[in-house]
Amino acid sequence: MLALGMFDGVHVGHQAVLNLAVEQANAFAGTAVAFSFPMHPSTLLRPEQAPPLLMNPETKAKHLILKGMQEVILQPFDHEFSQMEATGFVEFLCAHIPSLHTLCIGKNFRFGKNRIGDHLLLQESANAFGLQVLVAESESWGDGPVSSSRIRAALEEGRIGDVNQMLGRKYLMEGMVCSGNAVGRTIGFPTLNLNWNPQAHPCFGVYAGMVKNLRNDQKLPAVANYGVRPTLEKSSCEPLLEIHLLVEPDTEQWRTGIELQMELDFFLRPEKAFAALDDLKAQIQSDKNQALELLSPL
C-alpha cells in the first residue's frame, strides 16, 4: 500500500493519506509504504521559487514511520525523473515496487512532467495495472485547507497555535546543546544553547514550551529566545535557540552535548534590541513570569 506525496511537515492533511495506506495494509495483510522526495521538486525545476522545507529528509522519514509507515522511499528527484511523462508514472512504480496493490493520495496530488497528472489520470493509469487508487479528503483549519505553505506562513508570523493545529502535534525544535558565551548566566538567566537553523523556521522571538531531554526523557518548562540576539551581538550572526529552564535542573543531566527537543506552545513576543542590559534583564523576567503562567496548566 503506497502513500504518495511530498509530505513536508507530515501535517494532518498528509496524515489522512497515510491513514488510508495503514488501513489498507491492515485489511489486506500488506505493507504500508510512503513514497516521497528528499528535496522539493522546485529546487531543481524553479530554484528561485523553491519553498523552504519544514523538515529535512531524516526528520520527515522519522515522522512518517511514527505515523504507521513500515517503509519510506525517498526517490531522488533528478533531471531524468523530472522528465518522466505522467502516463509512465504508474508503470515506473510497478517496476520498482513489487506486489503493489493500492495507491493513496491527496486530492491535490500532481505527478509527471510539468505536473500534468492528477488523481483522475492516476486512476486511469492504475486501472491498466490492476491497482486501486484511494483519494483522501482535504483537512481544513480556519478559513482553508491545511497545507505546508500555510504552515510556513503561520510560522513566519508567530502563529504557533495555528501551526500546532495544522500539524496535529506540537512544533518541535531539536538539537545538541552547544557552548555559549555565558552572558545569560552572568545576568541571572542561564541558557542551554542550540545551533538550530532549518530552512523554514519560526519568526525570531520569545517562546514558551516544554523541553525534553532526549538522554533521560525528562521534560521541563522553559522560555526560549530564537534569533540573532540584537542587544548583545553588534554584527550579523547565525540564529541561535537559547533555552532558559523555568525550574532548577540537574546540571549533570542538562549540559553541553545533551540533545534536547523543545516543543513550542506559545509565542510571547518578537525579538528586539534593548538600549541597555538592565532593560533586557527586566524584559526576560517579564517573559519568564508570563511563560510560567501560561505553562502552569499544562
Task: Go through each PLM region and give its residues.
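N-terminal catalytic cores of NTP/NDP-binding nucleotidyl/phosphoryl-transfer enzymes
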Residues: M1-N56
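Phosphate/ribose-recognition catalytic cores of enzymes acting on nucleotide-derived substrates
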Residues: N181-L298
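Residue-level signal for inorganic ion chemistry
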Residues: H11, L64, L103, V163, ...
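N-terminal Rossmann-like or analogous alpha/beta NTP/dinucleotide-binding catalytic cores
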Residues: T43-F129
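A structural preference for short, hydrophobic beta-strand core positions in alpha/beta folds
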Residues: A34, L74, V135-A136
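Glycine-rich, Lys/Arg-enriched anion-binding loops that position phosphate/diphosphate groups
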Residues: A126-V228
